[in-house]
Every structure is written in structure tokens, then in C-alpha cells.
């Protein structure tokens, strides 16, 4: 009796969750990145000194500081609008994921650390100093990444323009379809590897190798 009740309850929670679960993530992230983008927009197209002095990861390091400033500014503003509307949610969520990784690597990540324990000292809201060394303050950006990831994988939910587009193009059945093959996990490993390679290169390389292996095996199975 209890299990039957629990199953019925979770069935309805999943049903409602398809509509409302992503909303909190979308609106909160939209607010945070809109505020950040508009704040930069008020400065203009000239990057301030603190931004111009940062070492950006490849390939953004090949661009000028002003070009990166404009890209980040408009990336945050447009992504915030898209998240509120639920339009092209996965694309703009992935865009914000890249922006966040670049910010962590350039601003928040310590230049050197001897152990994971020492690195974890930087999991803080404020800058942590240990014997005069910068330990980072990457807690909030990490939380943003954890919030962005479900939108990359699951999309904006049924209460979104993405859902209306699926209905308009008569592809609404795709919402319920799931494909948990090796290629799916290969794509997931690629996304996480792309993030990790700029922060902890060894982990990132291993994930990218795993991605290639999983994807290759998936294509091999199809032959």
C-alpha cells in the first residue's frame, strides 16, 4: 500500500517537475548573469585594467581584452534573456558554462597548488590567503556550474519556448525519448572533460580520452 502510494506520488512529482523544475534554475541564473552582463555593459566596450591584465585560456587568449569584454558582456546578457524565455536553452546554458569556466581559470583558480586539500582551500566565497599565497574563491562559480549543468543536459522544461517549438515542428515526442547508449555518455564525458581540462588538466584529458573511447565504441556498434 505504501509503495503504491509512493509510486503514484513520485509519478505526479515527475509530471509536475517537467514543467516547473527547471524554472528556478533558469530564473536565478538569468538574474545573476543579467546583472553581471549589464554591469559590464555600463562600463562600455573598453575593458577595464583588471580585466585586461587577466590570462585567458585558449582560444580566448588569442583575442584582445576588448573583444573578450564584449563577448562576455553580450554573452551574459543574451543568455540571461534566453533563459527567461526558455529559448535555445541548452545552447545558451552551454555558453554560460564556457563563460564560467573561463572566469574560474582566469580569475578564481589558484596559479599553483600542491594537493587537492590545498586546492580545496579555495572553495570559498572570499579570497583565501595561506602564507601569502592566493588560494582562490571559486565556490560561487562552481555552484553556478552545478546549476547550469542540468539545463545543458535536460533543457528548459515544458514551460519554455523550446517546448512550443517542438510542438510547432511536430516533434513533441522527443521530450519523452531517452537514449542512454555509449554515445550519450561519450558526449557527457566530453562536456565534463572540456570543463576539467582548463582547471585540472589530467582529469580533463582522461575524460576526453574516455569520451573518444565511448563515442568510438558507439559508432563501432552501429556498423
Where are these regions (language model features)?
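Extended, low-polarity transmembrane helix blocks
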Residues: 1-46, 62-74, 87-223
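Short Gly/aromatic-enriched secondary-structure transition segments
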Residues: 44-54
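Short, basic/aromatic beta-hairpin or loop at an interaction surface
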Residues: 54-61
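Extracellular/periplasmic metallocenter environments
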Residues: 79
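Juxtamembrane transmembrane-helix termini
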Residues: 82-86
Amino acid at each position: 500500500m505504501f509503495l503504491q502510494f509512493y509510486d503514484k506520488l513520485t509519478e505526479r512529482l515527475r509530471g509536475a517537475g517537467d514543467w516547473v523544475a527547471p524554472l528556478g534554475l533558469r530564473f536565478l541564473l538569468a538574474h545573476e548573469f543579467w546583472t553581471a552582463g549589464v554591469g559590464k555593459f555600463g562600463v562600455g566596450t573598453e575593458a577595464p585594467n583588471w580585466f585586461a591584465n587577466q590570462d585567458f585560456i585558449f582560444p580566448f587568449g588569442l583575442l584582445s581584452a576588448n573583444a573578450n569584454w564584449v563577448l562576455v558582456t553580450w554573452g551574459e546578457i543574451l543568455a540571461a534573456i534566453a533563459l527567461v524565455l526558455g529559448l535555445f536553452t541548452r545552447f545558451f546554458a552551454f555558453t554560460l558554462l564556457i563563460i564560467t569556466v573561463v572566469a574560474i581559470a582566469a580569475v578564481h583558480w589558484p596559479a599553483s597548488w600542491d594537493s587537492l586539500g590545498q586546492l580545496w582551500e579555495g572553495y570559498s566565497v572570499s579570497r583565501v590567503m595561506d602564507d601569502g599565497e592566493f588560494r582562490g574563491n571559486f565556490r560561487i562559480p562552481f555552484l553556478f556550474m552545478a546549476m547550469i549543468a542540468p539545463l545543458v543536459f535536460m533543457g528548459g522544461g515544458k514551460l519554455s519556448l523550446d517546448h512550443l517549438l517542438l510542438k510547432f515542428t511536430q516533434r513533441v515526442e522527443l521530450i519523452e525519448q531517452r537514449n542512454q547508449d555509449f554515445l550519450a555518455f561519450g558526449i557527457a564525458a566530453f562536456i565534463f572533460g572540456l570543463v576539467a581540462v582548463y582547471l585540472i588538466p589530467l582529469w580533463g584529458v582522461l575524460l576526453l580520452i574516455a569520451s573518444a573511447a565511448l563515442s568510438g565504441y558507439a559508432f563501432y556498434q552501429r556498423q
